Curated annotation (Swiss-Prot):
GO terms for molecular function: AMP dimethylallyltransferase activity. It catalyses: dimethylallyl diphosphate + AMP = N(6)-(dimethylallyl)adenosine 5'-phosphate + diphosphate. Keywords: Crown gall tumor, Cytokinin biosynthesis, Plasmid, Transferase. SUPFAM superfamilies: P-loop containing nucleoside triphosphate hydrolases. This is Adenylate dimethylallyltransferase. Transfers dimethylallyl groups to AMP as part of the biosynthesis of cytokinin phytohormones. Gene3D superfamilies: Crystal structure of tRNA isopentenylpyrophosphate transferase (bh2366) domain, P-loop containing nucleotide triphosphate hydrolases. GO terms for biological process: cytokinin biosynthetic process. It comes from Agrobacterium fabrum (strain C58 / ATCC 33970) (Agrobacterium tumefaciens (strain C58)).
Length: 243
């Protein structure tokens, strides 16, 4: 079985690349993302719309209400192993995402050391200014009012009605920044979807900068695998960490 691993920081184009390869190969994509396992925060977690998937298959490691909490890394890794093992008779599978903890679980596990051929592609952060331009565009899209999905701010306003969800939201990029923004400006969370244009731009910039901080931590803490078709990228002999 060929495993095509695509990993990199947020806003680096991983999902678009995975969809393109899925279109070319017909293989499903398994999302290496713990936050995307909560459909109630589909927009803020970056889950692609059905229309964006272009008839390709995307597999999430769980589907749970946010009040149950974010799936922990070890549980996500067990579910990933199950998905891959169950599909071992297939020609290939695409693994795509940027969960630091899940990728490091993979790096430590003997499961990935044999029985697979690998193609590994790592996307890089690159220039910070270019990243912020992409991140601002992405956040603006998350703020857009759409018929097929609530905006990030609408998701936040709805979920804020559930006290059990609040500490979880305060620990997720984007939502955390919006909550702090509301407190700074003495706004109720329910007011955020209707803020004026000036504050809208200010919040977009703030979230983009939070994404940059997260991307820098991803670049620092990701495991590093040999790229371009290495046979066993997670073997301890070849695995290193970026420091």
């Amino acid at each position: 079985m060929l495993l095509h691993l695509i990993y990199g920081p947020t806003c680096s184009g991983k999902t678009d690349m995975a969809i393109q390869i899925a279109q070319e190969t017909g293989w499903p994509v398994v999302a290496l993302d713990r936050v995307q396992c909560c459909p109630q925060i589909a927009t803020g977690s970056g889950r692609p719309l059905e229309s964006e998937l272009q008839s390709t298959r995307r597999i999430y490691l769980d589907s749970r209400p946010l009040t149950e909490g974010i799936l922990d890394a070890e549980s996500a890794h067990r579910r990933l192993i199950f998905e891959v093992d169950w599909r071992k008779s297939e020609e290939g599978l695409i693994l795509e995402g940027g969960s630091i903890s899940l990728l490091n679980c993979m790096a430590k596990s003997p499961f990935w050391r044999s029985g697979f051929q690998w193609h590994v592609k790592r996307l890089r952060l690159g220039d910070s200014d270019a990243f912020l331009t992409r991140a601002k565009q992405r956040v603006a899209e998350m703020f857009a009012i759409r018929e097929d999905r609530p905006s990030l701010l609408e998701e936040l306003a709805e979920l804020w009605n559930y006290p059990a969800a609040r500490p979880i939201l305060e620990d997720i990029d984007g939502y955390r920044c919006a909550i702090r923004f509301a407190r700074k400006h003495d706004l109720a969370i329910s007011q955020l979807p209707n803020i004026d244009a000036g504050r809208h731009v200010e919040l977009i910039e703030a979230i983009a900068n939070e994404y940059l901080e997260h991307a820098l931590s991803q670049e620092r803490d990701f495991p590093q695998w040999p790229e371009d078709g290495a046979g066993q990228p997670v073997c301890p002999v070849t695995l290193t960490r970026i420091r």
